[in-house]
Amino acid sequence: MLGLQSKQNPIQNPHTISTAHMGPLRKLRRVIENCCTSGGPATMSPIGVRLSVQDRYVTIDNGILQLTLSKPDGIVTGVQYNGVDNLMEVLNKEDNRGYWDLVWSEPGSNGIFDVIKGTDFRIIAEDDNRVEVSFTRMWDPSLKGTLVPLNIDKRFIVLRGSSGFYTYAIYEHLEGWPDFDIAETRVAFKLRKDKFQYMALADNRQRIMPMPDDRLPGRGQQLAYPEAVLLTNPINPELRDEVDDKYQYSIENKDNKVHGWVSFDPPIGFWQITPSNEFRTGGPVKQNLTSHVGPTTLAIFFSAHYSGADLVPKFRGGEYWKKVFGPVFMYLNSSWIFTDPQLLWEDAKIQMQIEVDSWPYNFPLSEDYPTIEQRGSVTGRLLIRDRHADDDYIYADSAYVGLALPGDTGSWQRECKGYQFWTRADAFGNFTISNVRTGDYNLYAWVPGFIGDYKFDATISITSGCFIDLGDIVYAPPRDGPTLWEIGIPDRSAAEFYVPDPNPNYVNRLYINHPDKFRQYGLWERYAELYPDGDLVYTVGESDYTKDWFFAQVTRKSDDQTSYIPTTWQIRFKLDTVYQNGSYKLRIAIASATYSELQVRFNNLNINPPHFSTGLIGRDNSIARHGIHGLYRLYSIDVKSVWLVEGENTIFLTQSRSTSPFQGIMYDYLRLEGPSGSDANERI
């Protein structure tokens, strides 16, 4: 059953900056407070936290903000702050303002969208320093087919002196309950469109946004799919002829820590802060939505975006499952003298770092949320052994190292039921993974600059308070022989390849002269415009992959423009000698695939079956959704010497599936290795 606990713990308020480890942040916050405030310091709010419970509403007030929740639904119906009676969209129905939701289905059925409404309300804690309330919805067999078979406990917390509120939830599927899939769960906030029109996701991803009305017929024209709209007659004429698409604002988990909206009159910021990734799925580079036109801000805990069904949790055979999502923090700030939304953004980043450094929090009272004392840590040093790159061990500089549920090597990127804990190694390969929940894990890693995945060969059992030192561990990346040639950088992204400018009729001006130009709409159409008479040909030793290798192998339209046809790329290279003893090896690392099949042929385009085929792979949809990667795949192809010739050789790469413009492959890296032990040590 869901655990409810009322034990009072001493509260460490993240809004009180510790001088022990927050010195620089404290100084910067003081500077910003000259013109920007998070509601003022706690001394400006001498009253404690007050809870008021009525028949249909629950109100929590700490003198800085007032949070109103429907009862027993647990929907955020109002947030009063800085003289504004409600920051939520008052034009929306009350159950369409601030809510937890999910998309679920019975096996083989279509997804059902469910705004989670509680049926029972409980006070978990109530004193001057903290109020925590609970809204639960319990499942029983009479609800089969109508509600997702989960017990759900939604929590909301307001602390004294805190300019914001926290929310988290516990989902539980009891043993023997029905099978189901859950494609997505999140917290969504719909803000007032007459106030919040400036959105910020990163230092270089901020802009005035369209109004939701601009996406409707008469003001906007739908493009290739409903999410993408060309603004033909927007309310703000400066946005005319821009493309709006929520997927242009996706962020990788590792960078998805703070985003939100700014109101100009009065100057207020509403920010969604996620202090930890432990409850998200898919690892550090899984991409998710953030904020978009609405104005909407999201805290997404898991989704199938940029991955497909591989990241949809599927519960079968009556398995037991419980997971805590959050807490996440909704932070409010304001400016005394408004000059630039950048001030509120900078303050929000400071608060984000404070929340991150305060994790795990000590104030949530669910027994399912472990304190820092109940968690453990793992440390070690990761080294790389690649005799063809260096005779000595190589430090795993900036490696991604993480703990996830036990599984096969690389399984972490598809794991979607448990918790994951990730860190980056330093320049010498040293890593520490702190504040890990108790349980059994495998340790996984991957290293930018090297192909493949690492998995430590033993299960790691985390107990309360443990500190496990693994010492030196060694990753030997896939390697059979010396590198003859390579294309790209093995970093699980296609960002290093050629990304074209968009059609000038379909631009998002935020991404003009921006490092993320791959987020522009319609780049898949640019391939055929750049290669009108034939497909891409890459010549090793002459071509430059930053200019001559298109970032995605997409389809092209047929001559009569009524259908799509496959594309075949060529890699041309010379071999002075073909060694007959031993096989060559072609490594193809794929950064993303969408309903694709890669067929590989050597020096014979017409041979069937091909020398190698991946079969049908991928549902990432990264091409349509402006990603530069999806799920990582690595293929190691044995290349028989009889397939090669002395002199000119050609590898044909055919993406053979072609019913849509969005089918295709993004390559991460390609490498041809000579036979092991041969004299083929000269790079081409």
Question: What positions do the PLM features span?
Answer:
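Short, ordered, surface-exposed loop/turn motifs in non-cytosolic proteins
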Residues: 377-378, 387-416
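A short, solvent-exposed beta-strand micro-motif common in secreted/extracellular proteins
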Residues: 429, 439-450
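Beta-strand-rich ligand-recognition modules
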Residues: 425-428, 564-581, 589-683
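Short, acidic Ser/Thr/Gly-rich low-complexity loop/linker segments typical of extracellular
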Residues: 409-430
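A short, amphipathic beta-strand motif
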Residues: 376-388, 429, 473
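Acidic-aromatic substrate-binding/catalytic surfaces of carbohydrate-active enzymes
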Residues: 55-121, 127-141, 146-148
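Structured interaction patches on ligand/partner-binding surfaces of diverse proteins
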Residues: 448-472, 476-478
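A contiguous, surface-exposed recognition patch within enzymatic or periplasmic domains that forms
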Residues: 190-323
